[in-house]
Design a protein with these regions (language model features):
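Accessory (non-catalytic) regions of SAM-dependent nucleic-acid methyltransferases
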Residues: 1-3, 11, 169-170, 181-243, ...
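A short glycine-rich beta-alpha junction/loop motif
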Residues: 2, 66, 82-89, 121-144, ...
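Short, ligand-facing micro-motifs at secondary-structure edges
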Residues: 22-42, 61-64, 68-86, 101-105, ...
Length: 436
């Protein structure tokens, strides 16, 4: 079918030259290409960057060096030039030699991955730069054949794309289901029937939040030098609580709320793990970075800066607003991570409260910064938390855990379906670009 020739990608793509500092006056009026998603959609913003920039002209082919094989490739359709970080590259293309839809399908195919493995020293890298991309040799058919292949792929992918859209809808549903469960929990809706059988008993912490709050104050180990938190005004309360509950400040029900050491610790090849924000952004602790500090450094840290079992980590910079429970092992954290030390008897309910939409909304309201937003620790202490009686907290936690387990099972089913669709997609592209 048609004539196939071995050509270098650089024969039909020409890199647009030019590299600029982020504060260069030459690009001061340009908006920024903030993201190129896997569907090839370009997202434009006015967010500044600290990274060197390139310029993308209208009609250029833009490629994400990090995610090109996942589909982050598009023709920029805007009317004005934009900037992009140097993790992107911009190309002028020869449309007499290449059909762009053909090329987009090719870079998502197993054939492209095999090309990288065979021709790039060291195999596939995390980022594909123009100096690696342009010299790659590929088999390219004539233009009419390219268009025929695109037509065939499009027909075969129509059903797959429909399934993929259904998967995205299911993902959004599962995510919203999580939010609804947590919001209903902290509003007392999950335990409305439970309260009918367990009415308020004044003075009993199990059935009266005021009594529980008093008990918490007795158990707290508080720095007396710390300023008293402001009272909660009626105008601040986002919703009405059930009878027997109480609005409290986060700082009123914790022994301490602080963050990691503000001075970068000396690195060690081994020792006590040093956790950074990327280690916990998934909601669990993963020692991906394998950074360590010395035992001597660790022992000199104030106790409130050492996470312990029952504590809650809370991301306060960048991907802020993510709570993470602490298990029984020793580590320390960077300053971008908050360390919440709740009074032990309410730790489980508090963790789910911090996951809830109302706490995320408060985080969004106080986060400040331009390129990277940060939640000040002072503002974190001021978060408003609904406090139910202790026995009701335990029932809420039980219900949440059971419901979220079902959501997790649903999410696993969605992931399996998504993997099946990905394999279908690869099979279609593999067949279209099989070696000749």
């Amino acid at each position: 079918m048609g004539e196939w020739k071995k050509v270098r990608i650089g024969e039909f793509l020409t890199e647009r030259q030019g590299r600029y500092k982020p504060d260069d006056n030459a690009i001061a009026t340009y908006k920024r290409l903030d993201k190129l998603d896997f569907s090839g959609t370009a997202h434009i913003s006015e967010k500044p960057s600290k990274t060197d920039m390139i310029v993308v002209q209208p009609g250029d082919l833009v490629i994400s060096g990090i995610n090109v094989a996942k589909g982050a490739i598009a023709v920029y359709q805007g009317m004005e030039p934009v900037t992009a970080t140097i993790h992107y590259s911009s190309y002028i293309f020869d449309d007499s030699a290449i059909d762009l839809n053909y090329f987009k399908y090719f870079v998502k195919s197993p054939a492209f991955i095999e090309t990288l493995k065979k021709q790039v020293k060291g195999g596939i890298k995390t980022e594909i730069k123009p100096k690696v991309f342009l010299p790659l040799e590929i088999l390219l058919p004539d233009l009419p054949t390219q268009k025929q292949i695109v037509k065939k792929i499009s027909v075969n992918l129509k059903r797959v794309n429909k399934l993929a859209k259904e998967i995205e809808t299911q993902k959004r549903y599962a995510k919203q289901l999580r939010r609804n469960i947590l919001q209903d929990a902290i509003e007392g809706k999950l335990t409305a029937d439970w309260r009918k059988e367990h009415p308020v008993q004044k003075g009993n912490p199990d059935y009266d939040a005021e009594a529980l709050f008093e008990l918490i104050q007795k158990e707290r180990k508080v720095d007396k030098k710390r300023k008293t938190l402001p009272p909660i005004l009626d105008a601040e309360k986002p919703f009405e609580l059930p009878t027997g509950w109480k609005w409290v400040r986060l700082g009123e029900i914790c022994n301490s709320i602080t963050d990691g050491d503000h001075l970068p610790p000396p690195k060690q090849p081994s020792g006590i793990p040093f956790v950074v924000i990327s280690d916990i952004s998934s909601g669990k602790i993963h020692f991906r970075n394998k950074r360590f500090v010395s035992r001597d450094y660790f022992n000199k840290l104030p106790r409130e800066k050492i996470p312990e079992t029952g504590d809650i980590l809370y991301t306060v910079t960048g991907s802020y607003g993510i709570p993470v429970p602490v298990n029984d092992f020793q580590f320390c954290v960077q300053r971008h991570i908050g360390i919440i030390k709740p009074v032990h008897l309410i730790k489980d309910f508090l963790f789910f409260s911090l996951m809830s939409p109302i706490c995320k909304k408060q985080a969004d309201g106080v986060a400040w910064g331009v390129a990277v937003k940060t939640i000040p620790i002072k503002e974190l202490r001021n978060f408003m938390i609904p406090l139910p009686p202790l026995a009701e907290q335990k029932e809420i936690v039980r219900l949440i855990e059971n419901m979220l387990l079902k959501v997790e099972q649903l999410e696993q089913q969605i992931l399996r379906r998504e993997e099946y669709i990905n394999q279908l997609m690869k099979g279609i592209l593999k067949g279209a670009f099989k070696e000749r």
